[in-house]
Amino acid sequence: MEENFYENEEKVDGYAEFTPTHDGTLLIDVLGEYLPEAAAVLELGMGPGKDFKKLSQRYRVTGSDFSQLFLQRYREQDPAADLLRLDARTLETDRTFDAIFSNKALIHLSSDELQQSFERQHELLNDNGLILHSLWFGEGERSFNDLTLVYHNEQDLTKMLETSFDIVALEKHAKMSDDDSIYVLARKK
């Protein structure tokens, strides 16, 4: 993961300005088809908190990020928010959830790190719990603004998830251009 990037105030400001209209409304609506209101949801990589706010309208949400700077900034807006500092690779918490959600937060993890994260997410989910994650669609890695972006396709994600999860939906969608993204919705076996 890109630890230093998200602790730099200038880069965090740039990130927030770069993504002003990119929120997870589509993803949250998909989750809403399968998850009852008031369920316990963990958001990974909440960043400036756009999706956290939307998720909070339906669910009991715990926001998380590895960036202390993002967490600090959100706490200034909402001191009562339930926030955790978590590394998406290891997810060191003893809390459990009905669903785990991320919108492009796991894009910096290598395939091995993503597999490790999925295994840990399985442990943190209650029975029949769900994951919903959006990632960049494609193959390989690319660099962007001092960050490494890892791309995934249907086959990669199916292989990583098939032993511990039943895949409910695996769909391409548009984030910045047609079919540049993929989301996976899966249920704990």
Per-segment meaning from a language model:
Residues F101:
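A conserved beta-strand element that flanks and buttresses the S-adenosyl-L-methionine
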Residues L124:
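Short alpha-helical functional segments enriched in proximate histidine and acidic residues
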